[in-house]
Amino acid sequence: MTIFSLWEDSPLTVIKGKNVILRPLKESDIPILYRYIYGKEHTEWKKYDAPYYPLEPMSLEAFASAMEKHLRKKEPPGRMIIEHLGEAIGTVNYYWEDESTRWLEAGIVIYPSRFWSRGLGTEALALWIDYLFQHLEIARVGLTTWSGNPRMIRAAEKLGMKMEGRLRKCRYYQGVYYDSIRMGIL
């Protein structure tokens, strides 16, 4: 992993791996992310990323307004773009489940399915977890998924994450019950 600033005196970091780069969100990424999330072209990702929560429609203007906080945020950014061969293909993020107890959860989405099952998500998540441990005062990074997303579970296990909890049959999607999976790494 190589970490460097975007430009001299820049507080924002770029994280370079072998096949992916994690970089801060740019204004020019907003319409790309909007098309991935709300467009008709790349919808396969939503079948695996908490599909039991409906995706509420949003205008591009409202989406851009919601993304502005990520444009202004300094280190450490809460969301970064995953780039592969110069193309923005997804995002990594973190959020505080409970900041007062330093309980942090991370997430990842690769939107176009043509980039799945190539190790890009695993590499991006590894870079992101390393970055979070280096830049935040935390002892653990958590990740929550569901039993309907075996690729996410495999990627987390490859990185040394342990299954810390399994809430059985608490996710209901298309007439089938699934388990909620809590994973973590110290």
Stretches with model-predicted labels:
Residues 1-32, 79-186:
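Acyl-donor (CoA/ACP) binding surface of acyl/acetyltransferases
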Residues 8-10, 66-70:
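Short, P/G- and charge-enriched loop/turn segments at secondary-structure junctions
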Residues 27-34, 38, 60-64, 68:
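An amphipathic alpha-helix signature
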Residues 39-40, 149:
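Short loop-to-helix capping motifs
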Residues 40-41, 136:
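Structural motif
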Residues 42-67:
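Conserved GNAT-fold acetyl-CoA-binding loop/helix
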Residues 70-75, 161:
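Short loop/turn motifs at secondary-structure junctions and domain boundaries
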